[in-house]
Each structure stands twice: as structure tokens, then as C-alpha cells.
Amino acid sequence: MKKLFQYSIYPVFMLSAFFSIIWLMKSGTNQYLATVPIIAVYGLAALLIERWMPFEKNWVNGTDWNLDFTYYIVNYLIKVSAQFTLIWLAVWIPFPQWFPTTLPFWMQVLLALTIIDFFLFFVHWQSHRYGWLWKLHAIHHSSERLYFLNGEKRHALHQILEGSPGIILCLVIGTPQPVVVAALAILAINMMMQHTNLDYKAGILKKFFCVAELHRWHHRADYKDAQVNYGAWLTVWDHIFKTAYDNPKIYHTEGIGEIGIKEEPNFPRTYWKQFWYPFKESVGRKSKL
């Protein structure tokens, strides 16, 4: 029974979230009122199941809950504000209508997800290559445990830099706003499952989707070990750009080791100290260029 749960929870979690969001968006419910309770319900579910069957027992409890929840709320508000800004721009700027709106709604959402996902991957990858971007992105890597809230732990400026390109492109090509909102909600739930402390197994799905088994390698404390698996939803980008990595033998025998930032053992632990940290400190893992 445990093994069945481990292999089925990811597809059940994501498919049910996907179709719940699609159904609510098509039902005429306010797009923001539709996604907030869905994200909250799946967040609560992720919290409960990862505490019931943890991958790493040392990650079950921590002192970072309030900090990470603050990041989640702040960054969600940034997303909503950005979308309202883009809606306002769309009213005043006659963007071309190139997006295939004749497709079924669920296919439109998958297409928008793919567009947004590529730019998330690309900016994330560059954030490990250039020092000025890394200083912002280091906030995400400062956690010393992985659990469902880590997915949205980003510096506010990095949140804007990482999310804007894909969303702006969607706007420019005429993607309907409900499609973008649905795509972002589904992505948020996948990020929960990507960072969760739940001991689940994705099986063949990890060849296609960015699951926890892959993303945990990305959070290893040693800089040289963490330059892998940048994707947020699809693994295809990591495979194309040769940044994909997996080692099941070591994963299941030795684990992934410590996570965090080895070069920064005294990283600030409050929101505002972390907010200002990139602007006045020389953060570890400097640019290689």
C-alpha cells in the first residue's frame, strides 16, 4: 500500500489540481477567487502528507515556517499585481492576437505553461552563472530543509525578473488572461511537489516532469553540485541545455547530503535582512564569468 501511494500521489495530485483549476476557470468563477482556494487546499494537503511520510525526518520541523509563508504571500501578491498591470496594458496597447484561442481551454493552458516554463528555466539557469543574479537567487537556496513552501521562496526582485519574460510574451501574443492565471496556478502546485519533503516516487514521469527526486539535487550545499535540474515544470529544457542530472543509486543509498549554501553558513534569517542582503553583501557562489 505504501509503495502504491508513493508512485500514485504525484500524478493524482497534479491531475486533480489541473482539472479542478480548468473546471473552475471555465465555470465563470472569478479567476483569482478560483485559484486561491485551490492553491490553499493543495498546500494544506502537501503539508499533511509530507509530515506523514517524510523523505528526510530532519526536514519535518524547522524555525523557517513564518519566513517562508511570508515569502509565499508576498510573491503571490506580486504575481497578481503583475497580471493586473498586464491587463491594463492590454487595454491600451493593441497587441497581435497570435495565440491559438480556438484550441480547447486545457490545451491553451498547457501551451501557456510551456512558454512560461521555458523562461523560468532560462532565467533560473542564468541566475547560477552571473553574480548579480545569484545574489538575488541565493535567497531561494538559503533554506536548510526542503518542504512544500520552498517553491515560492524568492527575493521579490528575482520573482519579477524570473516570472516576467514568459508572462509578457504570453500577453504580447494575445494569450487570454484566464489561461495565464490557470497556468500560473498549476505551476505553483507543481512547485509544491517539486520542493516537498514527501517521500514519493515519480517513476517514468521524472523523465518528463520536474519532480522532487530531481530537484533535490539542485539544492545541494556545494556550489559545483548544484548546477543541475533548473526546470520548474518540464525536464525538456534541462535535457536540451545539458543540465539534467539524476543518480538513483546514490539517491537511494547515500541520499543527497546537506542542502543550503555551504559558503554562507550565517545567512540572515528574517525577511527584511534577506531582502537587503544582496545589495550589501558578497554572496557565495560568485559568477564564473
Language-model features: locations:
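Membrane-helix interface linkers and caps
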Residues: 42-70, 90-100
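Short, hydrophobic transmembrane alpha-helix segments
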Residues: 20-33
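Hydrophobic alpha-helical transmembrane segments of polytopic
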Residues: 35, 39-42, 113, 183
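Cytosolic-facing loops and C-terminal tails of multi-pass membrane proteins
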Residues: 239, 250-289
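Aromatic-anchored segments of alpha-helical transmembrane domains
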Residues: 16-21, 189-193
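N-terminal membrane topogenic signal
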Residues: 1-12
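Membrane-embedded catalytic scaffold of the fatty acid hydroxylase/desaturase
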Residues: 70-257
